[in-house]
UniProtKB/Swiss-Prot annotation:
Job of this protein: PLA2 catalyzes the calcium-dependent hydrolysis of the 2-acyl groups in 3-sn-phosphoglycerides.
Residue numbers binding Ca(2+): 27, 29, 31, 48
UniProt keyword list: Calcium, Disulfide bond, Hydrolase, Lipid degradation, Lipid metabolism, Metal-binding, Secreted
Cofactor: Ca(2+)
Cofactor note: Binds 1 Ca(2+) ion.
Family label: Belongs to the phospholipase A2 family. Group II subfamily. D49 sub-subfamily.
Source organism of the structure: Gloydius halys (Chinese water mocassin)
Reactions listed under catalytic activity: a 1,2-diacyl-sn-glycero-3-phosphocholine + H2O = a 1-acyl-sn-glycero-3-phosphocholine + a fatty acid + H(+)
Active site: 47, 89
Tissue: Expressed by the venom gland.
InterPro entries (UniProt xref): PLipase_A2, PLipase_A2_Asp_AS, PLipase_A2_dom, PLipase_A2_dom_sf, PLipase_A2_His_AS
Broadest EC class assigned to this enzyme: hydrolase
Designated name of the protein: Acidic phospholipase A2 A
C-alpha cells in the first residue's frame, strides 16, 4: 500500500516520501510521462514500471508484510502478488537512498507535466 511505501522510504532513505517524492520530476507522484529528469526521478520511473508488471492485486491499496533483519527490509508473506508489491517498494526506497546526492528540489520539485512531453516517454 502507499502507506507502507511511505514507511519503507522513511526506514531506508530516512526521508518522508510524501514530502520528498510526491511531486518531483516527471515520475515521482501520481502518473508519469516524458523522460526521467535525474537519478531520483528514474527511481520513480522504475517503480512505476514495477507496479505496472504486478497483476492480480492493487499496488496502491493492498497491504503486504515485511520485516527488518540486520537493517535490511525483507518482504514476506504467502501472497506472491503482495510480495511483488513489497519488492517494488523496497527497491525504490533503496534507490532513493542511494541517489540522495543527486536530489535537486530547486530544479525538479513541482516540475509539472508541461515539462515532461508524452512523446519523449521511455518504454519500461
Amino acid at each position: 500500500s502507499l502507506l507502507q511505501f511511505e514507511t519503507l522510504i522513511m526506514k531506508v532513505a530516512k526521508k518522508s516520501g510524501m514530502v520528498w517524492y510526491s511531486n518531483y520530476g516527471c515520475y515521482c507522484g501520481w502518473g508519469g510521462q516524458g523522460r526521467p529528469q535525474d537519478a531520483t526521478d528514474r527511481c520513480c520511473f522504475v517503480h512505476d514500471c514495477c507496479y505496472g508488471k504486478v497483476t492480480g492485486c492493487d499496488p496502491k491499496m493492498d497491504v503486504y508484510s515485511f520485516s527488518e533483519e540486520n537493517g535490511d527490509i525483507v518482504c514476506g508473506g504467502d501472497d506472491p502478488c503482495k510480495k511483488e508489491i513489497c519488492e517494488c517498494d523496497r527497491a525504490a526506497a533503496i534507490c532513493f537512498r542511494d541517489n540522495l546526492n543527486t536530489y535537486n528540489d530547486k530544479k525538479y520539485w513541482a516540475f509539472g507535466a508541461k515539462n515532461c512531453p508524452q512523446e519523449e516517454s521511455e518504454p519500461c
